UniProtKB/Swiss-Prot annotation:
Subcellular location: Host endoplasmic reticulum membrane
Topology Cytoplasmic: residue spans: 171-185
Record's protein name: Membrane glycoprotein US10
Record: glycosylation sites: 111, 143
Gene encoding the protein: US10
Residue pairs linked by disulfide bridges in the UniProt entry: 39-129
Lumenal side: 25-149
Family that this chain belongs to: Belongs to the HHV-5 US6 protein family.
Residues of the signal peptide: 1-24
Keyword Signal attached: yes
Length: 185
């Protein structure tokens, strides 16, 4: 117990300061600290995942909804996305289920984004993720992120193997086109 005059003791001050830091660090903020996402369009189908890190008040009461926005006017052209989610007190993973794209004019805009909205009685958060085409370098990276969240490590290895083999074939072809022929032994 603290005695009168014990607050002059540096050890007691240090202990009280440390308890204050721990109490402040474990205080429930009721909002995510940060999030990561991986959303990709492959064969005219959107798939993605959003992972949130932080402290959530009660994961069971969070309601999630997601929308795909296409083009410049985000409110005019939007399409609902089905969401599956699992959450704990410190992190949440929301999978955007495969959704076929429907473009209003028949052509595909270049800039898609997915919006995940989480709501409960006393908090409301919106997370916007860019969506990339699978044929672009960022699309490959987002696809790898999505597969990592799903835990599909076999598919990740297939992509890396395909990239490695493709790079080897392209490099050899460029060397042959430039006139370099490897010496024979």
């Amino acid at each position: 117990m603290l005695r009168r005059g014990s607050l002059r003791n540096p050890l007691a001050i240090c202990l009280l300061w440390w308890l204050g830091v721990v109490a402040a660090a474990t205080e429930e903020t009721r909002e995510p600290t940060y999030f990561t996402c991986g959303c990709v369009i492959q064969n005219h189908v959107l798939k993605g995942a959003v992972k949130l890190y932080g402290q959530f008040p009660s994961p069971k009461t969070l309601r999630a909804s997601a929308w795909l926005h296409d083009g410049e006017n985000h409110e005019r052209h939007r399409q609902p996305i089905l969401v599956e989610g699992t959450a704990t007190a410190t992190e949440a993973l929301y999978i955007l289920l495969p959704t076929e794209l429907s473009s209003p004019e028949g052509n595909r805009p270049r800039n898609y984004s997915a919006t995940l909205t989480l709501a409960s009685r006393d908090c409301y958060e919106r997370f916007v993720c860019p969506v990339y085409d699978s044929g672009t370098p960022m699309g490959v990276l987002m696809n790898l992120t999505y597969l990592w969240y799903l835990g599909d490590y076999g598919a990740i290895l297939k992509i890396y193997f395909g990239l490695f083999c493709g790079a080897c074939v392209i490099t050899r072809s460029l060397l042959l086109i430039c006139g370099y022929y490897p010496p024979r032994e």
